[in-house]
Amino acid sequence: MTDDAFPSDRLNHILVAVETIEESLGTLARKQQLTRDAYKSDSDTQDIVERRFVKMTEAAIDIGEELVKQERGPPPQSNPEAMRALGDLGILTPSTAEQMAQGARFRNVLAHTYGQIIDHDVVYNALPDLERYRVFVVEIRDYLDSIGALDG
């Protein structure tokens, strides 16, 4: 880490992003009880799930970009790279970094597809796989705690 104290505006941005992830996890966890047929037949639910995945992953990417800029200066060149850089910096475990890089790629697919182009089976299949985001939040909080950013 740089020798400078962790800037409060950067920390606030990260903490708001963590809250967004946690809220999205709650919403998506409630949608896990839907059957595949119920999910695929309800376009409102599809929109909610897709949007929450996008918001949650964008929040994680924002966290990654903020921490990478704090730690090494230049921002990452891509969304998946932001997640891998957190692994390179020891902020995330290598496994979590790679899983979040996959999540960033999934976000790119969701953000740039619409209507009948979206494979709703792929999105439904992602619903049970929320653990990567939970672990991400834990590792980010652990890192912030380890550098004293959460003190005071």
In which residue ranges do the predicted regions lie?
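Solvent-exposed interaction patches of small proteins and small membrane subunits
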Residues: 1-152
